[in-house]
UniProtKB/Swiss-Prot annotation:
Family annotation (PANTHER family): HEMOGLOBIN FAMILY MEMBER, HEMOGLOBIN SUBUNIT BETA
GO molecular function, one term: heme binding
Tissue: Red blood cells.
Keywords of the record: Heme, Iron, Metal-binding, Oxygen transport, Transport
Protein name, as recorded: Hemoglobin fetal subunit beta
Length: 145
């Protein structure tokens, strides 16, 4: 999946990520850009506008939780299916989340990282992160197959 150099680059950049901020922004952007995903978060209160979503403390808290799980997965880049097995089961069997949403969230995360890290987020680093988020999305969708 990733070369040793790519793993090192991804790990190095992710060590600088402010999980609470990036997670909240990524989930918030997902809900704004892909509004049909809001149906999974109806209990979060006001999701009526971009400002409401991005300022919603429940969105921020859940975004942090999502990114914390992503960080744990980064520790097991060679076994993403194993790392995300229980979350795949939860999202498939209990929450019935469309697995396409995992890919969408991964792509939004890449956008947020590019926005926050600017020129440091080189095309090569983006390519490495894209491999990671694709791997995570596939691992989360594994239970669906």
């Amino acid at each position: 999946m990733l070369s040793a150099e790519e793993k090192a680059a991804v790990t190095s950049l992710f060590a600088k990520v402010k999980v609470d901020e990036v997670g909240g922004e990524a989930l918030g952007r997902l809900l704004v850009v892909y509004p049909w995903t809001q149906r999974f978060f109806e209990s979060f209160g006001d999701l009526s506008s971009a400002d409401a979503i991005l300022g919603n403390p429940k969105v921020k808290a859940h975004g942090k939780k999502v990114l914390d799980s992503f960080c744990e997965g980064l520790k097991q880049l060679d076994d993403l299916k194993g790392a995300f097995a229980s979350l795949s089961e939860l999202h498939c069997d209990k929450l019935h989340v469309d697995p396409e949403n995992f890919r969408l969230l991964g792509n939004v995360l890449v956008v947020v990282l590019a926005r926050r890290f600017g020129s440091e987020f080189s095309p090569e680093l983006q390519a490495s992160f894209q491999k990671v988020v694709t791997g995570v999305a596939n691992a989360l969708a594994h239970r669906y197959h």
